[in-house]
Amino acid sequence: MGTNKPVVIGIAGGSGSGKTSVTKAIFDHFQGHSILILEQDYYYKDQSHLPMEERLKTNYDHPLAFDNDLLIEHLHQLLAYKMIEKPVYDYTLHTRSEEVIPVEPKDVIILEGILVLEDPRLCELMDIKLFVDTDADLRILRRMQRDIKERGRTMDSVIEQYVNVVRPMHNQFIEPSKKFADIIIPEGGQNHVAIDIMVTKIATILEEKVNL
């Protein structure tokens, strides 16, 4: 482990923008190094105190759906090179699972999620802030493909959710958070030039921290 605090990279962007592809590309490049991925999706609020009919109304694209207090606490622990117990969210029960995942601290932390740039407290902890910017038509097509294939959703339900929830929340919260990004990556995981530049920048920051 390094003697300096870890490097934190925030990667935000709308659903289906290619955040995960960008995250994986960066992670794969540093494979074998001390690096971890922390997904904001794991930090939805515990709703075990609510009846199921209330849980079903959860808007997962709204900032208030996330337990950022716990996420920030865990980030501070990782920055101090302390282990955390990452929560697990059960989407079938619409609440937090009793299961936790032990996460060892690493020298590079990739924080990925639709709204990681929306909370100034999270932004303050980041060394590099990225926003993956992809055309809305492509994002809905990717989301449709994912939800139908992986989550057993119907096309009608995906479209209805997109029109009533995903698009309004994107326009209200996700898109405005783009202004806090240091770097905007168009075309998501297909933008190999931008990813290569990011990899070089991260390597430079790591080298600077080692030489301090």
From Swiss-Prot:
Similarity comment: family membership: Belongs to the uridine kinase family.
InterPro entries assigned: P-loop_NTPase, PRK/URK, Uridine_kinase, Uridine_kinase-like
Name listed for the protein in its UniProt record: Uridine kinase
GO BP, sorted A to Z: CTP salvage; UMP salvage
Pathway(s) where this gene product acts: Pyrimidine metabolism; CTP biosynthesis via salvage pathway; CTP from cytidine: step 1/3; Pyrimidine metabolism; UMP biosynthesis via salvage pathway; UMP from uridine: step 1/1
Subcellular location, record wording: Cytoplasm
Organism whose genome encodes this protein: Bacillus cytotoxicus (strain DSM 22905 / CIP 110041 / 391-98 / NVH 391-98)
Binding site for ATP: 13-20
